[in-house]
């Protein structure tokens, strides 16, 4: 994922002098959103909080990282918010309007004359879990066989793949496509050996929804966009990266929305909670099994070992 830039944004009041009552506000909490256009569906994510009597919102667009909303308010039976200035100068400002319908958050994104409908549902009620605990595993599943791309598909089938296997190592010779495992997983442990080129930027998506950043940043302080960060959401406790060109090992366990990561023998995440999807997620159906996805549309990565052990 592109290097994370944390931007502080001033919150606009929900309504001057009119505090929002939590007990009468059905918008509060988290929402897993699916937007639908004529050509595709794509995931979004929203969290609405009440702080000091005013609404505060956090939004995950289809790419990038979760950000605080600059504008959010309740207007009668509707929730209205904007993600801020348009992506390019002169473009119309994006505005979201939503209402509650049979327990769902039903909304639209409007940019000038373009309107995109979307529907949000509540995320799963995650059971108490400890990704760092001892687990009982099923048989190992070798996702990379060292020979070819059996068991993998392209995220964008109509675009060049760019992935090849040479001397038992999987690599993306040309940036441009992500690869997705054909198998889906619920709770699991994953073991991967990989290396990066200088300044390389890639990512590993768990269940296709939660990105662990893969970045050449050895020697730098841990960051929201640093190596093995839950991209834009959780900073690693330590940067355990090796320099570019050296083989690295990652041992990752995902149980519910809890993740533990050991990078090069050092624990960098210890049963941390993932609040929601990250940018680039395949969907927002957090309760469903999902694939492993390796990002190949940014920079070069080499992978020589990739094994998943499902948790019973």
Task: Please place each PLM-identified region on the residue numbering.
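Sec/Tat signal peptide C-region and signal peptidase I cleavage site
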Residues: 17-22
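Bacterial N-terminal signal peptides
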Residues: 5-15
């Amino acid at each position: 994922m592109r290097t994370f830039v944390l931007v502080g944004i001033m919150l606009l009041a929900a309504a001057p002098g009119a505090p929002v009552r939590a007990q009468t506000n059905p918008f509060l909490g988290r929402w897993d959103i699916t937007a639908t256009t004529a050509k595709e569906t794509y995931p979004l994510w929203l969290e609405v909080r009440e702080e000091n009597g005013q609404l505060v919102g956090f939004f995950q667009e289809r790419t990038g990282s979760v950000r605080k909303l600059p504008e959010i308010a309740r207007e009668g039976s509707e929730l209205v918010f904007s993600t801020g200035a348009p992506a390019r100068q002169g473009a119309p400002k994006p505005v979201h309007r939503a209402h509650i319908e049979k327990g769902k958050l039903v909304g639209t994104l409007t940019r000038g004359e373009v309107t995109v409908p979307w529907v949000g549902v509540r995320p799963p009620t995650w059971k108490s879990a400890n990704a760092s605990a001892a687990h009982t595993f099923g048989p190992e599943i070798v996702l990379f066989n060292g020979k070819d791309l059996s068991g993998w598909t392209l995220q964008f089938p109509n675009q060049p793949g760019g992935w090849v296997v040479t001397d038992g190592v999987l690599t993306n010779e040309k940036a441009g496509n992500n690869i997705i495992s054909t198998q889906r997983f619920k709770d699991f442990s994953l073991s991967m050996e990989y290396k990066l080129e200088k300044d390389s930027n890639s990512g590993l998506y768990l269940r296709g929804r939660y990105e662990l950043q893969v970045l050449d940043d050895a020697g730098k302080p841990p960051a929201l966009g640093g190596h093995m960060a839950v991209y834009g959401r959780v900073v690693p406790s330590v940067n355990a990266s090796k320099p570019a060109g050296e083989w690295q090992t990652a041992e990752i366990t995902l149980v519910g929305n809890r993740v533990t990561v050991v990078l090069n023998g050092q624990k960098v995440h210890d049963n941390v909670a993932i609040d929601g999807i990250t940018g680039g997620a395949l969907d927002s159906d957090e309760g469903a099994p999902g694939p492993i996805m390796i990002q190949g549309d940014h920079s070069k990565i080499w992978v020589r070992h990739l094994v998943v052990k499902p948790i019973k």
